[in-house]
């Protein structure tokens, strides 16, 4: 298993003028990895992220399920509404329509039967959004809620089980 990380910037993994991190993954990162012999499709790629990256991993798996074998999201930054997202981060979505198009909860059915693992601490400000997502995830998804906040301590504690989850699904 190879681990490749990217920084999706501050645009919440959806297209903005001059920035499209999802296109960067599809058009640049995956082809580069394939040239190196890593993550050969179909479905030998897993996505994982923390906070905004966790949201991005889920969004990527929803938009490109044919590419993704499994997905893990640690404290995914999932807003429950466009006004909430706009108030907290005005640059996250260009419009209410962009939020609706990229709402991980609304589009969770696109995950199909894809193995999914999500984790969030009860003290995480994104817990309400992650909890809403957990209610609509595919059957068999692993949901890990417990004590913790949106911080490095919680993230670090969730990295080993998330990586093990992905490795287990890539090995099959």
Where are these regions (language model features)?
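Non-catalytic cap/lid and distal C-terminal segments of serine-dependent acyl enzymes
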Residues: 1-172
């Amino acid at each position: 298993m190879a681990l490749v990380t990217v920084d999706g910037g501050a645009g919440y993994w959806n297209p903005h003028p001059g920035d499209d991190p999802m296109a960067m993954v599809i058009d640049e990162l995956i082809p580069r990895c394939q040239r190196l012999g890593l993550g050969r499709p179909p479905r030998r790629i897993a996505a994982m992220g923390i906070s905004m990256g966790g949201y991005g991993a889920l969004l990527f798996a929803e938009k490109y399920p044919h590419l993704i074998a499994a997905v893990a999201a640690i404290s995914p930054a999932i807003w429950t509404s466009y006004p909430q997202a706009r108030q907290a981060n005005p640059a996250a979505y260009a419009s209410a329509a962009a939020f609706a198009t990229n709402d991980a909860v609304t589009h969770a059915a696109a995950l199909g039967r894809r193995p999914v693992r999500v984790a969030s601490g009860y003290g995480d400000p994104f817990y309400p959004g992650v909890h809403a997502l957990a209610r609509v995830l595919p059957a068999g998804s692993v949901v890990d809620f417990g004590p913790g906040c949106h911080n490095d301590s919680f993230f670090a504690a969730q990295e080993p089980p998330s990586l093990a989850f992905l490795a287990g699904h890539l090995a099959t």
